[in-house]
Protein backbone atom coordinates (compact mmCIF):
# COMPACT_ATOMS: atom_id res chain seq x y z
CA UNK A 1 0.00 0.00 0.00
CA UNK A 2 1.27 3.45 -0.95
CA UNK A 3 0.49 6.30 1.45
CA UNK A 4 0.83 9.72 -0.19
CA UNK A 5 -1.34 12.85 -0.12
CA UNK A 6 -0.20 14.09 -3.54
CA UNK A 7 0.15 12.29 -6.86
CA UNK A 8 3.80 13.20 -7.61
CA UNK A 9 4.89 11.65 -4.31
CA UNK A 10 2.61 8.68 -4.94
CA UNK A 11 4.27 8.18 -8.33
CA UNK A 12 7.75 8.40 -6.82
CA UNK A 13 6.82 5.74 -4.27
CA UNK A 14 5.16 3.44 -6.81
CA UNK A 15 7.60 3.59 -9.71
CA UNK A 16 10.45 1.62 -8.08
CA UNK A 17 7.99 -1.27 -7.91
CA UNK A 18 6.31 -0.78 -11.28
CA UNK A 19 9.68 -0.56 -13.05
CA UNK A 20 11.42 -3.30 -11.07
CA UNK A 21 12.98 -6.17 -13.02
CA UNK A 22 13.23 -8.31 -9.90
CA UNK A 23 9.55 -9.14 -9.41
CA UNK A 24 9.64 -12.06 -11.82
CA UNK A 25 6.18 -13.59 -12.15
CA UNK A 26 4.68 -11.59 -9.27
CA UNK A 27 1.52 -9.62 -10.03
CA UNK A 28 1.71 -6.03 -8.79
CA UNK A 29 -1.49 -4.54 -7.29
CA UNK A 30 -0.73 -1.17 -5.65
CA UNK A 31 -3.01 0.09 -2.91
CA UNK A 32 -4.18 3.64 -2.23
CA UNK A 33 -4.77 4.67 1.38
CA UNK A 34 -7.95 6.74 1.35
CA UNK A 35 -7.70 8.11 4.89
CA UNK A 36 -7.11 11.90 4.77
CA UNK A 37 -6.76 11.78 0.96
CA UNK A 38 -9.01 14.28 -0.88
CA UNK A 39 -11.43 12.74 -3.37
CA UNK A 40 -9.83 14.51 -6.34
CA UNK A 41 -6.43 13.31 -5.17
CA UNK A 42 -7.74 9.75 -5.01
CA UNK A 43 -9.08 10.00 -8.55
CA UNK A 44 -5.77 11.41 -9.77
CA UNK A 45 -3.86 8.51 -8.22
CA UNK A 46 -6.33 6.00 -9.65
CA UNK A 47 -5.79 7.43 -13.12
CA UNK A 48 -2.03 7.19 -12.67
CA UNK A 49 -2.27 3.51 -11.71
CA UNK A 50 -4.46 2.76 -14.72
CA UNK A 51 -1.65 4.05 -16.93
CA UNK A 52 1.16 2.10 -15.23
CA UNK A 53 2.14 -1.54 -15.91
CA UNK A 54 0.20 -3.01 -12.97
CA UNK A 55 -2.43 -5.74 -12.77
CA UNK A 56 -4.92 -3.61 -10.85
CA UNK A 57 -5.26 -1.52 -7.72
CA UNK A 58 -6.79 -1.64 -4.25
CA UNK A 59 -8.49 1.05 -2.16
CA UNK A 60 -7.93 1.00 1.61
CA UNK A 61 -10.14 1.07 3.50
CA UNK A 62 -13.77 0.67 2.47
CA UNK A 63 -15.13 2.89 5.25
CA UNK A 64 -13.12 5.80 3.83
CA UNK A 65 -14.79 5.55 0.43
CA UNK A 66 -17.17 8.51 0.44
CA UNK A 67 -20.08 9.80 -1.60
CA UNK A 68 -18.06 12.59 -3.20
CA UNK A 69 -15.49 10.14 -4.56
CA UNK A 70 -18.30 7.96 -5.87
CA UNK A 71 -19.81 10.98 -7.66
CA UNK A 72 -16.46 11.84 -9.25
CA UNK A 73 -15.98 8.30 -10.53
CA UNK A 74 -19.53 8.17 -11.92
CA UNK A 75 -19.14 11.55 -13.65
CA UNK A 76 -15.87 10.52 -15.32
CA UNK A 77 -16.47 6.82 -15.98
CA UNK A 78 -20.21 6.30 -15.80
CA UNK A 79 -22.04 4.02 -13.42
CA UNK A 80 -20.32 0.79 -12.52
CA UNK A 81 -21.48 -1.99 -14.79
CA UNK A 82 -21.99 -5.57 -13.74
CA UNK A 83 -18.46 -6.96 -13.69
CA UNK A 84 -19.14 -10.37 -12.22
CA UNK A 85 -18.11 -12.00 -15.49
CA UNK A 86 -14.85 -10.05 -15.81
CA UNK A 87 -11.87 -12.36 -15.23
CA UNK A 88 -9.86 -12.02 -12.02
CA UNK A 89 -6.09 -11.69 -12.63
CA UNK A 90 -4.96 -13.82 -9.69
CA UNK A 91 -7.25 -16.76 -10.44
CA UNK A 92 -7.84 -16.36 -14.20
CA UNK A 93 -4.60 -14.91 -15.59
CA UNK A 94 -4.97 -16.29 -19.13
CA UNK A 95 -8.53 -15.03 -19.44
CA UNK A 96 -7.50 -11.67 -18.00
CA UNK A 97 -4.68 -11.33 -20.54
CA UNK A 98 -7.08 -11.95 -23.43
CA UNK A 99 -9.68 -9.61 -21.90
CA UNK A 100 -7.20 -6.77 -21.35
CA UNK A 101 -5.78 -7.14 -24.85
CA UNK A 102 -9.27 -7.02 -26.38
CA UNK A 103 -9.70 -3.65 -24.66
CA UNK A 104 -6.47 -2.44 -26.25
CA UNK A 105 -7.70 -3.52 -29.66
CA UNK A 106 -10.83 -1.41 -29.26
CA UNK A 107 -8.71 1.65 -28.47
CA UNK A 108 -6.53 1.11 -31.53
CA UNK A 109 -9.51 0.56 -33.80
CA UNK A 110 -11.06 3.79 -32.54
CA UNK A 111 -7.77 5.60 -33.21
CA UNK A 112 -7.56 4.42 -36.81
CA UNK A 113 -11.23 5.10 -37.54
CA UNK A 114 -11.64 8.50 -35.88
CA UNK A 115 -8.32 10.22 -36.51
CA UNK A 116 -5.41 10.49 -38.90
CA UNK A 117 -2.96 9.09 -36.35
CA UNK A 118 -2.57 5.85 -38.23
CA UNK A 119 0.58 3.76 -38.72
CA UNK A 120 3.17 5.40 -40.92
CA UNK A 121 2.35 3.56 -44.16
CA UNK A 122 -0.42 1.50 -45.72
CA UNK A 123 1.71 -1.62 -45.69
CA UNK A 124 2.63 -1.01 -42.05
CA UNK A 125 -1.04 -0.53 -41.20
CA UNK A 126 -1.94 -3.86 -42.79
CA UNK A 127 0.95 -5.55 -41.01
CA UNK A 128 -0.10 -4.01 -37.69
CA UNK A 129 -3.67 -5.23 -38.04
CA UNK A 130 -2.52 -8.71 -39.03
CA UNK A 131 -0.12 -8.91 -36.10
CA UNK A 132 -2.53 -7.62 -33.48
CA UNK A 133 -5.21 -10.04 -34.68
CA UNK A 134 -2.70 -12.89 -34.59
CA UNK A 135 -1.86 -12.01 -31.00
CA UNK A 136 -5.53 -11.79 -30.05
CA UNK A 137 -6.14 -15.23 -31.56
CA UNK A 138 -3.20 -16.68 -29.63
CA UNK A 139 -4.38 -15.17 -26.34
CA UNK A 140 -7.96 -16.33 -26.93
CA UNK A 141 -6.79 -19.85 -27.68
CA UNK A 142 -4.69 -19.87 -24.51
CA UNK A 143 -7.63 -18.62 -22.44
CA UNK A 144 -9.90 -21.34 -23.83
CA UNK A 145 -7.35 -24.15 -23.70
CA UNK A 146 -4.45 -23.50 -21.30
CA UNK A 147 -1.48 -25.60 -22.31
CA UNK A 148 2.28 -25.31 -22.53
CA UNK A 149 2.19 -25.20 -26.33
CA UNK A 150 -0.50 -22.51 -26.44
CA UNK A 151 1.41 -20.49 -23.86
CA UNK A 152 4.56 -20.64 -25.99
CA UNK A 153 2.59 -19.50 -29.05
CA UNK A 154 1.08 -16.58 -27.13
CA UNK A 155 4.44 -15.50 -25.71
CA UNK A 156 6.10 -15.63 -29.14
CA UNK A 157 3.27 -13.58 -30.67
CA UNK A 158 3.43 -11.03 -27.86
CA UNK A 159 7.22 -10.67 -28.07
CA UNK A 160 7.06 -10.19 -31.84
CA UNK A 161 4.27 -7.63 -31.46
CA UNK A 162 6.13 -5.67 -28.77
CA UNK A 163 9.33 -5.59 -30.84
CA UNK A 164 7.52 -3.81 -33.69
CA UNK A 165 5.14 -1.68 -31.67
CA UNK A 166 7.30 1.46 -31.52
CA UNK A 167 7.78 1.37 -35.27
CA UNK A 168 4.04 1.08 -35.85
CA UNK A 169 3.41 3.97 -33.45
CA UNK A 170 5.97 6.33 -34.99
CA UNK A 171 3.20 8.74 -36.07
CA UNK A 172 0.88 8.58 -33.02
CA UNK A 173 3.83 9.01 -30.65
CA UNK A 174 4.55 12.42 -32.17
CA UNK A 175 1.04 13.59 -31.34
CA UNK A 176 0.49 11.83 -28.03
CA UNK A 177 3.63 10.18 -26.61
CA UNK A 178 1.99 9.64 -23.21
CA UNK A 179 -0.82 7.56 -24.70
CA UNK A 180 1.62 5.38 -26.62
CA UNK A 181 3.58 4.84 -23.40
CA UNK A 182 0.37 3.79 -21.65
CA UNK A 183 -0.25 1.22 -24.39
CA UNK A 184 3.28 -0.09 -23.97
CA UNK A 185 2.65 -0.40 -20.23
CA UNK A 186 -0.52 -2.38 -20.85
CA UNK A 187 1.36 -4.77 -23.10
CA UNK A 188 3.89 -5.18 -20.27
CA UNK A 189 1.01 -6.01 -17.93
CA UNK A 190 -0.18 -8.72 -20.33
CA UNK A 191 3.37 -10.07 -20.42
CA UNK A 192 3.38 -10.15 -16.60
CA UNK A 193 0.08 -12.02 -16.56
CA UNK A 194 1.53 -14.69 -18.83
CA UNK A 195 4.61 -15.07 -16.61
CA UNK A 196 2.42 -15.34 -13.53
CA UNK A 197 0.17 -17.89 -15.21
CA UNK A 198 3.13 -19.94 -16.38
CA UNK A 199 4.29 -20.35 -12.79
CA UNK A 200 0.85 -20.75 -11.25
CA UNK A 201 -0.93 -22.86 -13.84
CA UNK A 202 1.39 -24.42 -16.40
CA UNK A 203 4.17 -25.44 -14.04
CA UNK A 204 1.72 -26.97 -11.56
CA UNK A 205 -0.10 -29.21 -13.98
CA UNK A 206 0.59 -31.56 -16.85
CA UNK A 207 -0.95 -30.69 -20.21
CA UNK A 208 -0.96 -32.62 -23.43
What are these regions (language model features)?
Residues 54-58, 95-207:
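Catalytic domains of carbohydrate-active enzymes that cleave complex glycans
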Residues 1-10, 16-20, 24-114, 161-168:
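Substrate-binding cleft of secreted/luminal carbohydrate-active enzymes
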Residues 4-26, 121-142:
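Ampipathic, surface-exposed secondary-structure segments
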Amino acid sequence: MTDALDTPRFQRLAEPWTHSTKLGSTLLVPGIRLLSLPSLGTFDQLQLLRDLPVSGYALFAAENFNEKLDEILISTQGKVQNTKHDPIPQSQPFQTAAFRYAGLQKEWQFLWEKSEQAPNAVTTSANFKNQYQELQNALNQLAILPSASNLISAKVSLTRFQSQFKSWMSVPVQENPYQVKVWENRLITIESLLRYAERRVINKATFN
